[in-house]
Amino acid sequence: MELKTEEEEVGGVQPVSIQAFASSSTLHGLAHIFSYERLSLKRALWALCFLGSLAVLLCVCTERVQYYFCYHHVTKLDEVAASQLTFPAVTLCNLNEFRFSQVSKNDLYHAGELLALLNNRYEIPDTQMADEKQLEILQDKANFRSFKPKPFNMREFYDRAGHDIRDMLLSCHFRGEACSAEDFKVVFTRYGKCYTFNSGQDGRPRLKTMKGGTGNGLEIMLDIQQDEYLPVWGETDETSFEAGIKVQIHSQDEPPFIDQLGFGVAPGFQTFVSCQEQRLIYLPSPWGTCNAVTMDSDFFDSYSITACRIDCETRYLVENCNCRMVHMPGDAPYCTPEQYKECADPALDFLVEKDQEYCVCEMPCNLTRYGKELSMVKIPSKASAKYLAKKFNKSEQYIGENILVLDIFFEVLNYETIEQKKAYEIAGLLGDIGGQMGLFIGASILTVLELFDYAYEVIKHRLCRRGKCQKEAKRNSADKGVALSLDDVKRHNPCESLRGHPAGMTYAANILPHHPARGTFEDFTC
């Protein structure tokens, strides 16, 4: 009987020799190194060239991998034409926070020192610097004899004493059609009571423009009311040395941050602001530093740098002063004038100017901003001064000192996309490595698989020869026994040799009644 030998069973088929594998391998040069010839100069040169190419390949691949993990990015700039564009939100603030005529005796009692109108003894600090008319009014309001102060609220004070858009707005047109003060939404900033045109809030649709150029945007004429400016006898955060308005052009998805991002418009000039919408797309870490997650805030739904800053400043003041400024969101109590002077203003100034670690606001991954180009002309001209003075029932001097015109429009009806892209992606890395492998050693991914497959067969065979596989196979054979093939059984059939045995060698019928008469051994084996 022919059985499989133990060597074949436990060790498997012996792998081909290294020479045979090299001759059939797709790796260039391997057949010349491991040839059947005796060691020669030719084989040594081939081995040297192969090792040199392999070393260069490893150096190049290492450099490519290191470059990939630097996570470089490039910036793509493109301009896209559009049939229409959403007009931006325009927020404007008078640089004077409170109208002098609206400051009551109770306001002066509580906030006079904050506004630098009174000293800590409730006295006018420097009467020589005051205008006679203003001084007379102020002296009357500052007489607190037998005065009983009433409750005071900073939010109510800002709302009541701030400049009213209905008094400031002399003319308004959007795309040639008349607009009014009703199209402006009240918003509080660090400049006090401000107004936003085209806010897109309170159910109002966002206005769109179909053309570029002047006359196709917002044109307003404003009276800044310098006669209502508070007299300046000292330097505080609530007093202003300038006259005019502060303007910020921004997306409807972000709150105004006008004290940091606004630009000034002076009276006596018509200011033209040519805009271009810019859509910026930044990459998240590790290619960039943008914030790809939603904002974790109780005050704002969408993330933006301005929303992050306002949220952070609010938390900072609540933690340090136990109150919030009027322009800050939340439900914490408003700061009193004393808290404004002693804590809130100094704390916020410190946070904005010096503390670079508390408020770290990352760039959002998608951002819309508006590039601006400003130009201006003098207004009124000598020819129009008398007409405007008559039209608004003011003097020519008042017109020159208080009237301004602001014209905001898109330069052209397109938008600019500024997009960060990965400079080197995984596909490029694999392509470079594959190209270098083909150039230096003529290999591919399948070639590498060939090498691993051959190495696996060799290692497996050697481990089995050491006896590990033999012990396992012996345990298996003890359980299963020896397997015989059908041919083996036929060749060793015991019945063949017993055919034709003597007839007398039979069993009695009563022993095996259902069996035919057979030979003694034939019956048991067959």
UniProtKB/Swiss-Prot annotation:
It catalyses: Na(+)(in) = Na(+)(out); Ca(2+)(in) = Ca(2+)(out). Disruption phenotype: Knockout mice lacking Asic1 display absence of acid-evoked currents in hippocampal neurons and impaired hippocampal long-term potentiation (LTP). An absence of acid-evoked currents in amygdala neurons and an alteration of amygdala-dependent behavior including deficits in cue and context fear conditioning are also observed. This is associated with altered spatial learning, memory capability and fear conditioning. It is a multi-pass membrane protein. Glycans are attached at residues 366, 393. One of its GO terms (biological process) is establishment of localization in cell. The record marks 79 as: Involved in channel desensitization. It comes from the Eukaryota. The modification Phosphoserine is found at residues 477, 497. The record marks 355 as: Involved in proton-dependent gating. Residues 67-425 are extracellular. GO terms for molecular function: inorganic cation transmembrane transporter activity; ligand-gated sodium channel activity; monoatomic cation channel activity; monoatomic ion-gated channel activity; pH-gated monoatomic ion channel activity. The chain crosses the membrane at residues 50-66, 426-456. pH-gating could be regulated by serine proteases. Keywords: Calcium, Calcium transport, Cell membrane, Cell projection, Disulfide bond, Glycoprotein, Ion channel, Ion transport, Membrane, Phosphoprotein, Postsynaptic cell membrane, Sodium, Sodium channel, Sodium transport, Synapse, Transmembrane, Transmembrane helix, Transport. Forms voltage-independent, pH-gated trimeric sodium channels that act as postsynaptic excitatory receptors in the nervous system, playing a crucial role in regulating synaptic plasticity, learning, and memory. Upon extracellular pH drop this channel elicits transient, fast activating, and completely desensitizing inward currents. Displays high selectivity for sodium ions but can also permit the permeation of other cations. Regulates more or less directly intracellular calcium concentration and CaMKII phosphorylation, and thereby the density of dendritic spines. Homotrimer. Heterotrimer; with other ASIC proteins producing channel with different properties. Interacts with PICK1; regulates ASIC1 clustering in membranes. Interacts with STOM; alters heterotrimeric ASIC channels activity. This is Acid-sensing ion channel 1. It comes from Mus musculus (Mouse). The lineage of its organism: Eukaryota, Metazoa, Chordata, Craniata, Vertebrata.
